[in-house]
Amino acid sequence: MATVEACLRTFDHYGNRDNKLRARMKWLVDTMGIDELRERIIKERKFLRASATYPGGIPAIVEERGDAPAGIGTAVSADGGVPVEIKGLDDYRRWDMANVVRGRANGTVSAYAYCRLGDITTDQFRGLAQIQRDYGIDIRITNRQNFVLRGLTEEQLPEIHNRLREYDMHEPGVELARDVVSCPGADTCNIAVTQSRGLASDIGRALDEAGLAEVGGVRINISGCTNSCGQHHISDIGFLGIERRAHGKSAPGYQMLLGGHLGNMEIAFGEKATKLPAKAAAESVVRVVGKFASERTAGETFSDWLGRSGGAAGVGTLLKDLDVFPTPEENPAYYVDFDETGPFTAEIGESECATWA
Protein backbone atom coordinates (compact mmCIF):
# COMPACT_ATOMS: atom_id res chain seq x y z
CA MET A 1 0.00 0.00 0.00
CA ALA A 2 2.85 2.36 0.78
CA THR A 3 4.38 1.78 -2.66
CA VAL A 4 1.06 2.44 -4.38
CA GLU A 5 0.57 5.64 -2.40
CA ALA A 6 4.15 6.71 -3.14
CA CYS A 7 3.57 6.22 -6.87
CA LEU A 8 0.41 8.34 -6.72
CA ARG A 9 2.11 11.11 -4.76
CA THR A 10 5.08 11.14 -7.12
CA PHE A 11 2.79 11.46 -10.12
CA ASP A 12 0.84 14.24 -8.39
CA HIS A 13 4.12 16.11 -7.88
CA TYR A 14 5.63 15.67 -11.33
CA GLY A 15 2.92 14.35 -13.68
CA ASN A 16 0.61 16.17 -16.08
CA ARG A 17 -3.10 15.86 -15.33
CA ASP A 18 -4.12 18.79 -17.52
CA ASN A 19 -3.58 16.91 -20.79
CA LYS A 20 -5.42 13.58 -21.00
CA LEU A 21 -2.98 12.25 -23.56
CA ARG A 22 -0.08 12.76 -21.15
CA ALA A 23 -1.83 11.89 -17.87
CA ARG A 24 0.07 8.62 -17.68
CA MET A 25 2.97 7.33 -15.62
CA LYS A 26 4.63 6.22 -18.87
CA TRP A 27 5.20 9.86 -19.80
CA LEU A 28 7.09 10.43 -16.56
CA VAL A 29 9.25 7.45 -17.45
CA ASP A 30 9.81 8.96 -20.90
CA THR A 31 10.71 12.45 -19.70
CA MET A 32 12.41 11.66 -16.40
CA GLY A 33 13.92 8.24 -17.04
CA ILE A 34 13.06 5.05 -15.19
CA ASP A 35 16.01 5.26 -12.78
CA GLU A 36 15.23 8.82 -11.70
CA LEU A 37 11.52 8.04 -11.36
CA ARG A 38 12.22 4.93 -9.30
CA GLU A 39 14.51 6.90 -7.00
CA ARG A 40 11.85 9.55 -6.40
CA ILE A 41 9.16 6.96 -5.71
CA ILE A 42 11.39 5.14 -3.21
CA LYS A 43 12.22 8.46 -1.55
CA GLU A 44 8.51 9.25 -1.28
CA ARG A 45 7.79 5.80 0.11
CA LYS A 46 10.41 6.16 2.84
CA PHE A 47 8.73 9.41 3.82
CA LEU A 48 5.53 7.44 4.43
CA ARG A 49 7.14 5.53 7.30
CA ALA A 50 5.82 8.16 9.69
CA SER A 51 2.54 8.58 7.85
CA ALA A 52 -0.72 7.72 9.60
CA THR A 53 -1.95 6.28 6.30
CA TYR A 54 0.35 3.28 6.68
CA PRO A 55 0.25 2.02 10.29
CA GLY A 56 3.20 -0.06 11.36
CA GLY A 57 5.63 1.38 8.86
CA ILE A 58 6.92 -0.28 5.72
CA PRO A 59 7.48 -4.06 5.96
CA ALA A 60 11.15 -5.01 6.07
CA ILE A 61 10.80 -7.25 3.02
CA VAL A 62 9.56 -4.29 0.97
CA GLU A 63 12.53 -2.17 2.01
CA GLU A 64 14.90 -5.06 1.29
CA ARG A 65 13.56 -5.97 -2.15
CA GLY A 66 12.30 -2.60 -3.29
CA ASP A 67 10.27 -2.61 -6.48
CA ALA A 68 12.21 -5.33 -8.26
CA PRO A 69 10.02 -7.55 -10.46
CA ALA A 70 9.43 -11.16 -9.56
CA GLY A 71 11.87 -12.46 -12.16
CA ILE A 72 11.55 -15.17 -14.76
CA GLY A 73 10.72 -18.59 -13.41
CA THR A 74 9.01 -17.47 -10.21
CA ALA A 75 5.67 -16.25 -11.55
CA VAL A 76 2.57 -18.22 -10.70
CA SER A 77 0.61 -19.47 -13.70
CA ALA A 78 -2.47 -21.61 -13.97
CA ASP A 79 -2.34 -21.99 -17.76
CA GLY A 80 -2.46 -25.54 -19.02
CA GLY A 81 -3.97 -27.00 -15.86
CA VAL A 82 -6.36 -29.92 -15.92
CA PRO A 83 -9.96 -28.77 -15.41
CA VAL A 84 -11.44 -30.30 -12.29
CA GLU A 85 -14.57 -30.13 -10.17
CA ILE A 86 -13.85 -30.01 -6.46
CA LYS A 87 -17.24 -30.46 -4.85
CA GLY A 88 -17.71 -32.93 -2.00
CA LEU A 89 -14.49 -32.05 -0.11
CA ASP A 90 -13.96 -30.20 3.16
CA ASP A 91 -13.33 -26.45 3.05
CA TYR A 92 -9.57 -26.65 3.45
CA ARG A 93 -9.16 -29.35 0.79
CA ARG A 94 -11.32 -27.42 -1.67
CA TRP A 95 -9.28 -24.29 -1.03
CA ASP A 96 -6.01 -26.22 -1.41
CA MET A 97 -7.05 -27.69 -4.76
CA ALA A 98 -8.36 -24.41 -6.18
CA ASN A 99 -6.22 -21.67 -4.66
CA VAL A 100 -2.80 -23.24 -4.04
CA VAL A 101 -0.09 -23.52 -6.71
CA ARG A 102 3.06 -25.56 -6.16
CA GLY A 103 6.19 -24.74 -8.12
CA ARG A 104 7.57 -27.84 -9.76
CA ALA A 105 11.00 -26.37 -10.44
CA ASN A 106 11.94 -24.80 -7.10
CA GLY A 107 9.46 -26.32 -4.65
CA THR A 108 7.83 -23.00 -3.79
CA VAL A 109 4.20 -22.76 -2.71
CA SER A 110 1.84 -19.89 -3.50
CA ALA A 111 -1.72 -19.40 -2.28
CA TYR A 112 -4.44 -17.12 -3.61
CA ALA A 113 -6.66 -14.85 -1.56
CA TYR A 114 -9.97 -14.69 -3.41
CA CYS A 115 -11.65 -11.32 -4.02
CA ARG A 116 -15.15 -11.63 -5.45
CA LEU A 117 -15.46 -9.16 -8.34
CA GLY A 118 -12.05 -7.81 -7.36
CA ASP A 119 -13.50 -5.98 -4.35
CA ILE A 120 -11.50 -5.64 -1.14
CA THR A 121 -12.35 -3.83 2.08
CA THR A 122 -9.97 -1.80 4.22
CA ASP A 123 -10.00 -4.51 6.89
CA GLN A 124 -9.14 -7.17 4.31
CA PHE A 125 -6.32 -5.06 2.88
CA ARG A 126 -4.82 -4.46 6.31
CA GLY A 127 -5.33 -8.14 7.13
CA LEU A 128 -3.27 -9.14 4.10
CA ALA A 129 -0.60 -6.64 5.10
CA GLN A 130 -0.44 -8.23 8.56
CA ILE A 131 -0.12 -11.71 7.03
CA GLN A 132 2.75 -10.40 4.91
CA ARG A 133 4.51 -9.08 8.01
CA ASP A 134 3.91 -12.22 10.07
CA TYR A 135 5.19 -14.64 7.44
CA GLY A 136 7.71 -12.48 5.58
CA ILE A 137 6.27 -13.32 2.17
CA ASP A 138 5.49 -11.53 -1.08
CA ILE A 139 1.90 -10.57 -1.87
CA ARG A 140 1.03 -9.53 -5.39
CA ILE A 141 -2.09 -8.58 -7.32
CA THR A 142 -3.09 -10.83 -10.21
CA ASN A 143 -4.72 -9.83 -13.49
CA ARG A 144 -7.81 -11.75 -12.40
CA GLN A 145 -8.35 -9.32 -9.53
CA ASN A 146 -7.14 -11.59 -6.73
CA PHE A 147 -4.05 -11.61 -4.50
CA VAL A 148 -1.33 -14.26 -4.55
CA LEU A 149 0.75 -14.99 -1.43
CA ARG A 150 4.18 -16.19 -2.58
CA GLY A 151 7.03 -17.94 -0.83
CA LEU A 152 5.00 -20.12 1.53
CA THR A 153 5.82 -23.57 2.86
CA GLU A 154 3.52 -26.59 2.96
CA GLU A 155 3.42 -26.37 6.76
CA GLN A 156 2.11 -22.80 6.65
CA LEU A 157 -0.87 -23.53 4.40
CA PRO A 158 -3.40 -24.54 7.12
CA GLU A 159 -2.52 -21.41 9.09
CA ILE A 160 -2.82 -19.23 5.98
CA HIS A 161 -6.22 -20.76 5.22
CA ASN A 162 -7.44 -19.92 8.72
CA ARG A 163 -6.09 -16.37 8.48
CA LEU A 164 -7.79 -15.83 5.13
CA ARG A 165 -11.00 -17.22 6.59
CA GLU A 166 -10.89 -14.44 9.21
CA TYR A 167 -11.05 -11.89 6.39
CA ASP A 168 -13.54 -13.85 4.24
CA MET A 169 -10.95 -14.35 1.49
CA HIS A 170 -10.70 -18.14 1.70
CA GLU A 171 -13.38 -19.11 -0.79
CA PRO A 172 -12.13 -21.55 -3.46
CA GLY A 173 -12.68 -19.44 -6.53
CA VAL A 174 -9.41 -18.73 -8.30
CA GLU A 175 -9.37 -20.15 -11.83
CA LEU A 176 -12.83 -21.61 -11.28
CA ALA A 177 -16.02 -20.62 -13.08
CA ARG A 178 -17.13 -18.33 -10.23
CA ASP A 179 -13.97 -16.21 -10.64
CA VAL A 180 -15.66 -13.79 -13.03
CA VAL A 181 -13.60 -10.74 -14.04
CA SER A 182 -15.32 -7.49 -14.97
CA CYS A 183 -14.38 -3.91 -15.71
CA PRO A 184 -16.07 -1.25 -13.51
CA GLY A 185 -18.75 -0.74 -16.16
CA ALA A 186 -21.39 1.95 -15.89
CA ASP A 187 -20.94 2.03 -12.11
CA THR A 188 -18.10 4.50 -12.54
CA CYS A 189 -16.98 4.57 -16.20
CA ASN A 190 -18.29 7.40 -18.34
CA ILE A 191 -18.00 5.49 -21.62
CA ALA A 192 -19.50 2.19 -20.45
CA VAL A 193 -22.77 1.09 -22.02
CA THR A 194 -23.86 -1.52 -19.47
CA GLN A 195 -23.51 -2.47 -15.81
CA SER A 196 -20.89 -5.16 -16.33
CA ARG A 197 -20.29 -5.69 -12.61
CA GLY A 198 -23.98 -6.38 -12.16
CA LEU A 199 -23.82 -9.06 -14.84
CA ALA A 200 -20.72 -10.57 -13.21
CA SER A 201 -22.59 -10.84 -9.93
CA ASP A 202 -25.62 -12.38 -11.67
CA ILE A 203 -23.42 -14.96 -13.40
CA GLY A 204 -21.83 -15.91 -10.08
CA ARG A 205 -25.28 -16.32 -8.53
CA ALA A 206 -26.56 -18.45 -11.43
CA LEU A 207 -23.49 -20.71 -11.37
CA ASP A 208 -23.82 -21.20 -7.61
CA GLU A 209 -27.49 -22.12 -7.95
CA ALA A 210 -26.71 -24.56 -10.78
CA GLY A 211 -23.88 -26.22 -8.83
CA LEU A 212 -21.35 -25.14 -11.48
CA ALA A 213 -19.43 -22.42 -9.63
CA GLU A 214 -16.46 -24.71 -8.94
CA VAL A 215 -16.01 -26.07 -12.44
CA GLY A 216 -12.38 -25.49 -13.38
CA GLY A 217 -10.74 -24.69 -16.69
CA VAL A 218 -13.10 -21.92 -17.81
CA ARG A 219 -12.49 -18.19 -17.56
CA ILE A 220 -15.26 -15.61 -17.83
CA ASN A 221 -14.53 -11.93 -18.53
CA ILE A 222 -16.87 -8.98 -19.09
CA SER A 223 -16.44 -5.50 -20.55
CA GLY A 224 -19.18 -2.89 -20.35
CA CYS A 225 -18.50 -1.56 -23.85
CA THR A 226 -16.54 -2.36 -27.01
CA ASN A 227 -13.24 -1.47 -25.37
CA SER A 228 -11.32 -4.36 -23.86
CA CYS A 229 -10.73 -3.24 -20.28
CA GLY A 230 -12.36 -6.45 -19.02
CA GLN A 231 -10.22 -8.57 -21.41
CA HIS A 232 -13.34 -10.26 -22.75
CA HIS A 233 -11.60 -11.02 -26.04
CA ILE A 234 -9.03 -13.42 -24.54
CA SER A 235 -11.28 -15.36 -22.17
CA ASP A 236 -13.03 -18.68 -22.69
CA ILE A 237 -16.38 -16.94 -22.30
CA GLY A 238 -16.46 -13.21 -22.93
CA PHE A 239 -19.14 -10.52 -22.96
CA LEU A 240 -19.06 -6.93 -24.22
CA GLY A 241 -21.86 -4.53 -23.40
CA ILE A 242 -24.04 -3.18 -26.21
CA GLU A 243 -27.34 -1.35 -26.62
CA ARG A 244 -30.21 -3.45 -27.97
CA ARG A 245 -33.50 -2.25 -29.43
CA ALA A 246 -36.73 -4.19 -28.91
CA HIS A 247 -40.39 -3.21 -29.12
CA GLY A 248 -39.36 0.39 -29.73
CA LYS A 249 -37.32 0.56 -26.52
CA SER A 250 -33.62 0.57 -25.65
CA ALA A 251 -32.45 -2.37 -23.57
CA PRO A 252 -29.12 -3.52 -22.10
CA GLY A 253 -27.51 -6.35 -24.03
CA TYR A 254 -24.29 -8.24 -24.62
CA GLN A 255 -22.33 -9.79 -27.44
CA MET A 256 -21.10 -13.20 -26.32
CA LEU A 257 -17.67 -14.42 -27.45
CA LEU A 258 -16.31 -17.93 -27.03
CA GLY A 259 -12.89 -19.52 -27.33
CA GLY A 260 -10.45 -16.74 -26.48
CA HIS A 261 -7.29 -17.78 -24.67
CA LEU A 262 -3.77 -16.68 -23.90
CA GLY A 263 -0.97 -19.06 -22.92
CA ASN A 264 1.30 -21.86 -24.05
CA MET A 265 3.00 -19.50 -26.52
CA GLU A 266 -0.22 -18.76 -28.41
CA ILE A 267 -3.07 -16.30 -28.36
CA ALA A 268 -6.56 -16.52 -29.83
CA PHE A 269 -9.33 -13.93 -29.72
CA GLY A 270 -12.82 -15.14 -28.91
CA GLU A 271 -15.28 -15.48 -31.77
CA LYS A 272 -18.86 -14.21 -31.82
CA ALA A 273 -21.41 -16.73 -30.58
CA THR A 274 -24.64 -14.75 -30.19
CA LYS A 275 -26.16 -11.52 -28.90
CA LEU A 276 -28.23 -11.67 -25.74
CA PRO A 277 -30.42 -9.53 -23.50
CA ALA A 278 -28.46 -8.64 -20.37
CA LYS A 279 -30.95 -10.50 -18.20
CA ALA A 280 -30.46 -13.72 -20.23
CA ALA A 281 -26.65 -13.68 -20.26
CA ALA A 282 -26.26 -15.58 -16.98
CA GLU A 283 -28.43 -18.43 -18.27
CA SER A 284 -26.25 -18.66 -21.38
CA VAL A 285 -23.19 -19.11 -19.17
CA VAL A 286 -24.90 -21.83 -17.14
CA ARG A 287 -25.71 -23.70 -20.34
CA VAL A 288 -22.21 -23.42 -21.80
CA VAL A 289 -20.37 -24.26 -18.58
CA GLY A 290 -22.74 -27.14 -17.89
CA LYS A 291 -22.25 -28.55 -21.38
CA PHE A 292 -18.47 -28.20 -21.09
CA ALA A 293 -18.41 -29.87 -17.67
CA SER A 294 -20.47 -32.84 -18.85
CA GLU A 295 -18.80 -33.40 -22.22
CA ARG A 296 -15.09 -32.68 -21.74
CA THR A 297 -12.54 -35.45 -21.58
CA ALA A 298 -9.70 -35.72 -19.05
CA GLY A 299 -7.28 -32.83 -19.48
CA GLU A 300 -9.29 -31.22 -22.27
CA THR A 301 -9.22 -27.43 -22.36
CA PHE A 302 -12.23 -25.26 -23.05
CA SER A 303 -10.89 -24.23 -26.46
CA ASP A 304 -10.29 -27.87 -27.45
CA TRP A 305 -13.80 -28.82 -26.35
CA LEU A 306 -15.22 -25.84 -28.24
CA GLY A 307 -13.35 -26.88 -31.39
CA ARG A 308 -15.00 -30.29 -31.46
CA SER A 309 -18.41 -28.88 -30.49
CA GLY A 310 -18.93 -26.74 -33.56
CA GLY A 311 -16.95 -23.68 -32.50
CA ALA A 312 -18.42 -20.44 -31.20
CA ALA A 313 -21.04 -20.29 -33.93
CA GLY A 314 -22.10 -23.89 -33.35
CA VAL A 315 -22.51 -23.47 -29.61
CA GLY A 316 -24.15 -20.10 -30.21
CA THR A 317 -26.99 -21.74 -32.15
CA LEU A 318 -27.90 -23.63 -28.97
CA LEU A 319 -28.45 -20.28 -27.24
CA LYS A 320 -30.57 -18.55 -29.86
CA ASP A 321 -33.75 -19.14 -27.87
CA LEU A 322 -32.36 -16.81 -25.20
CA ASP A 323 -32.09 -13.89 -27.63
CA VAL A 324 -35.72 -12.91 -27.18
CA PHE A 325 -37.08 -9.74 -25.61
CA PRO A 326 -40.51 -9.89 -24.01
CA THR A 327 -42.57 -6.74 -24.31
CA PRO A 328 -42.02 -4.06 -21.66
CA GLU A 329 -45.43 -4.94 -20.25
CA GLU A 330 -44.65 -8.67 -20.03
CA ASN A 331 -41.27 -8.26 -18.33
CA PRO A 332 -40.09 -4.69 -17.68
CA ALA A 333 -36.90 -6.01 -16.02
CA TYR A 334 -35.44 -6.68 -19.48
CA TYR A 335 -35.39 -2.93 -20.08
CA VAL A 336 -33.67 -2.02 -16.80
CA ASP A 337 -29.97 -2.75 -16.32
CA PHE A 338 -28.52 -4.48 -13.28
CA ASP A 339 -28.35 -2.31 -10.15
CA GLU A 340 -30.49 0.38 -11.83
CA THR A 341 -34.04 1.47 -11.02
CA GLY A 342 -35.06 3.32 -14.17
CA PRO A 343 -35.36 2.49 -17.87
CA PHE A 344 -32.10 1.73 -19.68
CA THR A 345 -30.45 4.54 -21.63
CA ALA A 346 -27.09 4.24 -23.37
CA GLU A 347 -25.68 7.55 -22.20
CA ILE A 348 -22.01 7.97 -23.05
CA GLY A 349 -20.10 10.69 -21.22
CA GLU A 350 -16.69 12.24 -21.74
CA SER A 351 -13.83 9.80 -21.33
CA GLU A 352 -11.60 10.24 -18.30
CA CYS A 353 -8.61 8.76 -20.13
CA ALA A 354 -7.00 8.88 -23.56
CA THR A 355 -9.22 6.14 -25.00
CA TRP A 356 -11.48 8.55 -26.82
CA ALA A 357 -9.40 11.70 -26.60
Positions of PLM-derived features:
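Peripheral terminal and linker regions in Fe-S/redox and tRNA-modifying enzymes
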Residues: 1-357
